[in-house]
């Protein structure tokens, strides 16, 4: 388990107020920040830090990137889009969101229009 700490008291003055990530499984300490004596990302064995007092510092795991997520919200009825495909002259100002951009529905190709309708309306999540 990894724990974040700030050293508040130590025999080694270089450790005062430094921030570390302690990995108890590997018995390693990674320096996050120190005024002097240690470099950022320097790794030492925990016992090399000697005797010290510390306070816990909350750490936040970096988000995992698993591929893009994108949500376009269009507040329309399916019938409206289907009617716009059949009668584009009735909907010259119909604007929808596609890939983060606002676009006139009638400017899309028929294939793109069908794709928008298929992706916009679902029976369940």
UniProtKB/Swiss-Prot annotation:
<dbReference type="InterPro" id="IPR001150">
    <property type="entry name" value="Gly_radical"/>
</dbReference>
<feature type="domain" description="Glycine radical">
    <location>
        <begin position="5"/>
        <end position="125"/>
    </location>
</feature>
<dbReference type="Pfam" id="PF01228">
    <property type="entry name" value="Gly_radical"/>
</dbReference>
<comment type="function">
    <text>Acts as a radical domain for damaged PFL and possibly other radical proteins.</text>
</comment>
<protein>
    <recommendedName>
        <fullName>Autonomous glycyl radical cofactor</fullName>
    </recommendedName>
</protein>
<feature type="modified residue" description="Glycine radical">
    <location>
        <position position="100"/>
    </location>
</feature>
<dbReference type="InterPro" id="IPR019777">
    <property type="entry name" value="Form_AcTrfase_GR_CS"/>
</dbReference>
<dbReference type="GO" id="GO:0005829">
    <property type="term" value="C:cytosol"/>
</dbReference>
<dbReference type="InterPro" id="IPR011140">
    <property type="entry name" value="Glycyl_radical_cofactor_GrcA"/>
</dbReference>
<dbReference type="GO" id="GO:0008861">
    <property type="term" value="F:formate C-acetyltransferase activity"/>
</dbReference>
<dbReference type="InterPro" id="IPR050244">
    <property type="entry name" value="Auton_GlycylRad_Cofactor"/>
</dbReference>
<keyword id="KW-0556">Organic radical</keyword>
């Amino acid at each position: 388990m990894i724990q974040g700490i700030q050293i508040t008291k130590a025999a080694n003055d270089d450790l005062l107020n430094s921030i570390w990530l302690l990995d108890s499984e590997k018995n390693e300490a990674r320096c996050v920040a120190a005024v002097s004596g240690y470099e950022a990302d320097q790794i030492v064995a925990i016992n090399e830090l000697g005797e010290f007092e510390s306070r816990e510092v909350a750490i936040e795991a970096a988000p995992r990137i698993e591929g893009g997520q994108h949500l376009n919200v269009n507040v329309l009825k399916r019938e409206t889009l289907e009617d716009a495909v059949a009668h584009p002259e009735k909907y010259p100002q119909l604007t929808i969101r596609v890939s983060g951009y606002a676009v006139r529905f009638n400017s899309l190709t028929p294939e793109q229009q069908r794709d928008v309708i298929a992706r916009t309306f679902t029976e369940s999540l």
